[in-house]
Amino acid sequence: MKSLFSKMSQNKTTCLHFLLILNVSVLSATVVQAQSSSPVNRIIENLFRDSPALGTFTRTPEMDIDFTVIDEQYGEFDINDVRKVLVDMRVNNRSPIVAPIVRIPLAARDAPQDVVRQLLDAGVFGIMFPDIETQEQATAAISSMRFPQTADADQVPPGLRGSGSGSAPGYWGVSEEEYRTQADVWPLDPAGKLVAMIQIESLTGIRALNEILEVPGIGVIFLGPTDLANSTGAEGPNAPTVEALVQEVLQVCLARNIPCGYPIVANSHQEAERETARRLAEGFKVLAVMTRAQ
């Protein structure tokens, strides 16, 4: 962990840095080795290997990380902006080493199919869905990421992505046929290379959590304590009432063997390191560590 925050301190940009640490000791899936011509989603690869994966929410990752979340939640969504980031992430005109994930606009939460189709057709490796509050929204999220399934595949949730794949096969560096066999959500499809990250950010979402988790294909449940505080009238994300709800969600996820995530905001690398260790000890499997230190 010390080396992680040493890397953070070397970055001199003025924005906040977001590092995601996936500790996945509870997962027991068997490794599915990718063909040499296939892209590697390092989130999934590390999950299978029972190793942490490091990521960031910045558009221009400068460190040796496993993935980056391109944040499109705020402002006007523009697929061309995302495509430019994806091009910049390629290495020697080959599929990126850092797996690109996109957080979609909140306005697309209830009907994400069109936005998600554009993003997947561009070649992203996963989608983060903000403020999911119902089983129906979670189902729509997973369905939007799946092609219509063949008779011998899992039919639930049904795939609504459509029949085309855009430029994604070329971005991944695989054939159209290879892409279609790999472009499904993990862990519902153990060989899938797409990750669905579901954010729970309200009391309504927490109350519906058990129903939400009945939806197959969820890769990560990620908490939003600041928005949770706003939805409950608490003074802030560290309020005891918010912390109690955070622990409630964590216990549900642990019982269901689903990685649970939490964002840490720290004023120094040392504080971030301490909080990271504490949350990992509690059982969180995904941590977004934010530090304001320069």
Residue locations for each model-derived region?
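Hydrophobic alpha-helical membrane-insertion segments, chiefly the h-region
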Residues: 27-29, 224
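Expand to "…catalyze enediolate/carbanion chemistry for C-C bond making/breaking, isomerization
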Residues: 34-294
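Bacterial N-terminal signal peptides
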Residues: 17-27
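Residue-level detector of solvent-exposed, low-hydrophobicity positions
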Residues: 12, 25, 178-179
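Compositionally biased, low-complexity segments
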Residues: 2-5, 21, 32
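N-terminal secretory signal peptides that target proteins for export/translocation
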Residues: 1-13
